[in-house]
Amino acid sequence: MPDPIAPPVAGLPADAVELVCRAVSGGDLEAALAQYEDGAVLQRWAQDPGGDGDTVAEALTALMDLRLPVSVQMRAVVLAGAVALVLSQRHIIGTGPDCEPVQLSGAGATVVRRQQGGGWRIAVDAWHLSGPGAGQAQC
């Protein structure tokens, strides 16, 4: 049964990144995916740049499997008309489902595009998380 409450719409470019982190933290894949355009790309920097990566859903599910909160700090937003580049720092810290400590952090670069209704959705997202526990979620 679909969720009767629609996920929020990003009013600003940085909001789309924040809403993804909140949805992943809450284990809500549908709400996280709602922030991405159809056909969006989420590239994990640890992957071969020329290779086929996971789908957005697969990458976000891998993060959600940690069952830990994702925090984000915005570093810069560069706006060019209906497109924006959002640079951020993301952090995941806690004890994973296997009772092992997880401490991941790293940079993110996100291209966000204004939609016809005025909201913003992610077209391209690149995450690099590293640190102790990086083997469990290399995003």
Regions found by a protein language model. Name each.
Residues 93-103:
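Short, cysteine-centered beta-strand-loop-beta hairpins and adjacent loop/turn segments enriched
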Residues 9, 29-81:
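A solvent-exposed, acidic/Ser-Thr-rich amphipathic alpha-helical stretch
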Residues 43, 87-89, 123:
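Beta-strand residues in well-ordered beta-sheet regions across diverse protein folds
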Residues 2, 105-137:
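Short beta-strand edge/turn micro-motifs at domain boundaries
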Residues 1-38, 134-139:
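Short, low-complexity N-terminal intrinsically disordered segments enriched in polar/charged residues
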Residues 81-92, 106:
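A short hydrophobic beta-strand element
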